[in-house]
Amino acid sequence: MLDIKFIRENTEAVKANLVNRHNDFDLDEVIELDRKRRELLQMTEALKSERNAETKKIALAKKNKEDASAAISAMREVGTKIAAIDKELAGVELILQDRLLRIPNMTDASVPVGKDDSENPEVRRWGEIRKFPFPAKEHYELGENLGILDSERAGKVSGARFYFYLSMAARLERAVYNFMLDVHTQQNDFTEVIPPYIINGASMQGTGQLPKFEDDMYKVEGENMYMTPTAEVPLTNYFSGEILDGAVLPVHLTALTPCFRKEAGSAGKDTRGLIRQHQFHKVEMVKYCKPEDSWDELESLTAEAEKILQLLKLPYHVVCLCTGDIGFSSAKTYDIEVWMPGQQKYREISSCSNCLDFQARRANIRFRRHQRDKPEFVHTLNGSGLAVGRTVAAIMENYQQEDGTIVVPDVLRSYMNGLEIIGKRESFVSSKGE
């Protein structure tokens, strides 16, 4: 959330940021609400001073045994006015708070201005794209041919955008996320967390999912609770409402969770395969740090996500999201996109973002540099490390062989009892009813 004082003093810059983000939010309404709020505060303060003066008159009159009825009447009239203004003020503040929660973060000056993902500049690339001596298949075709991915039966059980992982696909998924967690906790100095998967509305608001993105989340019927869309939410809210000792910063947390998303607005996109599912695993990384350290932390966070792909020997490139593509809460984001031979293009597998104090203001997360210092807002960062299903898909496509089998990457073999090749699964014996 942006500070209202910052908005008041930098109105044109905030408007320009909205234009660059292609966001049609009406900032003038916020400016008017802020003006009205300050006007009402001044009115009520003036009336309270008047009421205090009348109270003193009443006390003096009673002390002198004089008639205080006029002063009492005047005080009651002032009290009625104060109550009316306070009621109006509460209404204005409620609307103002709602509008402030809908304003996106300010993008950093280094973020390129652009309309959409087609204008995200490449920052760097890594790895050599393999040249196949045969037509490369997409992962879902490979998985279905091997009998280890089943969308048909998942559709019967749950609907579109779900999969059953069977046998070695399930083992591969498990190997991938255990490998990721081991790298982050043993090499990258993250603390592993198992967070709640059902999250309250206040926490969703803290990270910026609410109120803007409610339509893309699964809500628990009859409750202000949601299925987690990403571990960013519980990990970032771990310290909500707290003041940290600056000596503990930075704090680095990582978690594997299932993620649940409606994928609203994705009709017709990636209707087959593991790229865009309603339910998927993701290893998330979240950092809390002092303001002066957050840009260095963004670079290290991105490198930590890249390290997973490098160890898996999967080619990728890094792009910087432009103003028209960057997320609501982010000041700057790097997307890591892995090469998918079956699709002949790069696909997003991680987003690494510096949110500055935007989320910390919403969730009220602060720190003190020293015991007597005034609390400051921390800076928060988050990044996928990585999306597990997309990593499995990338492994299947990049490590496929002409006969449709899949070579297990070297670093994963110890997680799969030394298995080197994923071959065809023997089908279940089944009989279909009439």
Regions found by a protein language model. Name each.
Residues R125-E434:
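TRNA-recognition modules of translation machinery and tRNA-sensing kinases, especially anticodon-binding
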